[in-house]
């Protein structure tokens, strides 16, 4: 089915840019300014780490990043505002992150952040400022289809962030711009930053979870959920105790390295995290095989209101870095649920991660939606 890039807002119209202080959002603002738009920058203050973060910190929306965003805005000659979203970020992202670990899941806080404080709250703020659209530095594409805007993977597969935006609604897509989705590579983005004299042109990409700058997420979870990081037994599929672990939070389904069990005739993988007994269940790779996946929190971006009752063919990603698996998506037993049946078993299906659906046309580039992974078999 044909699709074309959506027409940009009228030249001179106001576009609000979510500026994190990194090169991607900075170039986004610069490109829109070059195109003649009335650009306004918004930066979210999400988390107070108790001390300013230096230039080497690889997070986003922290002290140094806010400073960098303001410098870029000054360079571009655009208005720039900082919004204090710390309380709502804690409520909508950090607390659910900790609760998810307490349930033995492997959460993705970036999806929650996009779903709530960015595309709900920040978009509302952009509209309040008279903006016609909110632009971000995400590497995804928004194209026009017969029924309205669609979400597509970025041109550069190595930079594609569509997995993290599966929860973006159809209504939100109509108000969002992603100018970097058509970039051939990150090098092209950095080259634009240097051409425009932006100080962040060589700034490293953010790597850490923004509210865990030192990488010690267990400490954050323990502070929010005292007692959740509890040591326990490592057992095989028959319940035989093989060793002990420092806390389930340190493990995810499918993990092999760092389990701490040696001397086995074959490699052992994390099969399940039993939060009731604090047991870490390990087994052979074959025990990870799953074909059916229960999905909750379904967001549907394909045609109609959801997957077809007879099943919708798609390719399904169960982790950001995993290849998509062919299969079918069926409606679930309740609203907001779906059932995924893969053609062949996948390994490492972890509760708390997302199952994101891609269409079979256009080189699997169109995002049909997604949801949160629950039980699998």
UniProtKB/Swiss-Prot annotation:
Catalytic activity, as annotated: S-sulfanyl-L-cysteinyl-[protein] + uridine(34) in tRNA + AH2 + ATP = 2-thiouridine(34) in tRNA + L-cysteinyl-[protein] + A + AMP + diphosphate + H(+)
Functional description taken from the UniProt entry: Catalyzes the 2-thiolation of uridine at the wobble position (U34) of tRNA, leading to the formation of s(2)U34.
Sites marked Interaction with tRNA: 138, 353
Record-stated family: Belongs to the MnmA/TRMU family.
Compartments (UniProt record): Cytoplasm
Coarse class of the protein's main subcellular location: cytoplasm
Organism phylogeny: Bacteria, Pseudomonadati, Pseudomonadota, Alphaproteobacteria, Rhodospirillales
Protein source organism: Rhodospirillum rubrum (strain ATCC 11170 / ATH 1.1.1 / DSM 467 / LMG 4362 / NCIMB 8255 / S1)
Record protein name field: tRNA-specific 2-thiouridylase MnmA
This protein's UniProt keywords: ATP-binding, Cytoplasm, Disulfide bond, Nucleotide-binding, RNA-binding, Transferase, tRNA processing, tRNA-binding
Annotated segments matching region Interaction with tRNA: 159-161
Enzyme's top EC category: transferase
InterPro entries xrefs: MnmA-like, MnmA-like_C, MnmA-like_central, MnmA-like_central_sf, Rossmann-like_a/b/a_fold
Chain's gene name: mnmA
GO biological process, alphabetically ordered: tRNA wobble position uridine thiolation
Keyword Disulfide bond: yes
MF-aspect GO terms: ATP binding; tRNA binding; tRNA-uridine 2-sulfurtransferase activity
Active site: 113, 210
E.C. designation(s): 2.8.1.13
Protein residues bound to ATP: 18-25, 44, 137
Record PANTHER family: MITOCHONDRIAL TRNA-SPECIFIC 2-THIOURIDYLASE 1, TRNA 5-METHYLAMINOMETHYL-2-THIOURIDYLATE -METHYLTRANSFERASE
GO cellular component: cytoplasm
Pfam families per the UniProt record, alphabetical: tRNA_Me_trans, tRNA_Me_trans_C, tRNA_Me_trans_M
Disulfide bonds: 113-210
């Amino acid at each position: 089915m044909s699709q074309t890039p959506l027409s940009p807002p009228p030249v001179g119209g106001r576009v609000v840019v979510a500026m994190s202080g990194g090169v991607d959002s900075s170039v986004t603002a610069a490109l829109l300014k070059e195109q003649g738009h009335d650009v306004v920058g918004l930066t979210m203050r999400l988390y107070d780490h108790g001390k300013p973060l230096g230039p080497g910190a690889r997070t986003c929306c922290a002290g140094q990043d806010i400073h960098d965003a303001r410098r870029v805005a000054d360079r571009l000659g655009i208005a720039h505002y900082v919004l204090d979203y710390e309380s709502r970020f804690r409520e909508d992202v950090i607390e659910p992150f900790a609760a998810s670990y307490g349930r033995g899941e492997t959460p993705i806080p970036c999806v929650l952040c996009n779903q709530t404080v960015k595309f709900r709250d920040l978009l509302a703020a952009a509209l309040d400022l008279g903006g016609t659209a909110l632009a971000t530095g995400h590497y995804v594409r928004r194209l026009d289809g017969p029924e309205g805007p669609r979400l597509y993977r970025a041109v550069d597969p190595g930079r594609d962030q569509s997995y993290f935006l599966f929860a973006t609604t159809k209504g939100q897509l109509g108000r969002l711009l992603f100018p970097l989705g058509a970039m051939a590579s990150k090098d092209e983005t950095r080259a634009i930053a240097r051409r425009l004299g932006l100080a962040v042109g060589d700034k490293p990409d953010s790597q850490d979870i923004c509210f865990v700058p030192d990488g010690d997420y267990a400490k954050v979870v323990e502070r929010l959920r005292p007692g959740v990081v509890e040591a326990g037994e490592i057992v095989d599929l028959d319940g035989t105790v093989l060793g002990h672990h420092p806390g389930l939070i340190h493990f995810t389904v499918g993990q092999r390295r760092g389990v701490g069990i040696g001397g086995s005739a074959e490699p052992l993988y994390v099969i399940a995290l039993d939060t009731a007994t604090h047991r870490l269940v390990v087994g052979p790779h074959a025990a990870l095989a799953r074909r059916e996946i229960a999905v909750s929190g379904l967001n549907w971006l394909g045609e109609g209101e959801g997957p077809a009752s007879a099943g919708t063919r798609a390719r399904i990603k169960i982790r950001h870095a995993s290849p998509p698996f062919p299969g079918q998506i069926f409606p679930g037993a309740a609203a907001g649920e779906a059932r995924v049946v893969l053609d062949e078993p996948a390994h490492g299906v972890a509760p708390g991660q997302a199952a994101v659906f891609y269409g079979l046309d256009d080189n699997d580039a169109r995002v049909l939606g997604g949801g949160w992974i629950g039980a699998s078999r």
